[in-house]
Amino acid sequence: MKKLTTGKIWQFAAGQFGWAMLSGIISNWLVYFYQPDKTAISQGQTVFIPQGLVVFGIFTIIGGITAFGRIFDAFTDPMIASLSDRCTSKNGRRIPFLKWASLPLALSTVLVFWSPVNKNSWINGVFLLIMILAYYLSITAYCTPYNALIPELGHTQQERLNISTVISFTFIAGTAVAYLAPTIWGMFIPAFGRVGAIRMTFTLMAAIAFICMLVPVFCIREKDYVDTVPAKESAFGSLAATFKNAEFRKFVASDIFYWIALTMFQTGLPFFVTSLLKLPETMTTLYFVGMTALS
């Protein structure tokens, strides 16, 4: 097996930059777009879905859709992992998934913000639910095999550490670019209006992310670095066996709390900046960069 060079590590990490940017768009701006505050509405933001606690008197539409999407994601994760483990493609077990998931992931991210009815409508809510499910399925189909490649491409502890360090950087960079969105759509507002400018911004970002996600597909020959042996175990059989490991259960618990905290931070930051501090949307980027540097 070949050793992964520094250049190849960065080519692999380009994929992380791409999906992190798309993930950042959804995490940072989904709720902000569909549950706008008074400031955003006064600036021309259209209200596309019913507001308030309209789902059983407990959830907002956007909250219910987001929660259902996360539950859907929890079920598809082991299924995609199993399909990838058992893949018999000549190009390896992981790269084919990265190849075919890239375009659906980029498209679904854009379409999440492309409501078919240009006013408050339940049709938009149904469309949003479908697009959110498509997004979560696509990002799972890309990220699960992608993350599985990390220990497979690194043959030693140092190599795996190098890969993890670089992709950590590109993850932060991709998320930071997603936070630049207000600065970019501010330039488009005079020509397209607020909603059109936001959609144009996310479309451009998704196009860049799509290209980045394809970099490891065309630059890394998986079988040159990984001795791929398709697995035969079922998805839920492997999952049950894995959860028998007490240390793994501890890791999963800590990972859950990590993602809950990160999601709360990413979703709430735009509202904190605009609603509480009464600052321009563009300040969101500075707050993210500043807090990331301090952390």
Name each region found by the language model.
Residues 1-295:
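Membrane-embedded alpha-helical bundles of multi-pass transporters/translocases
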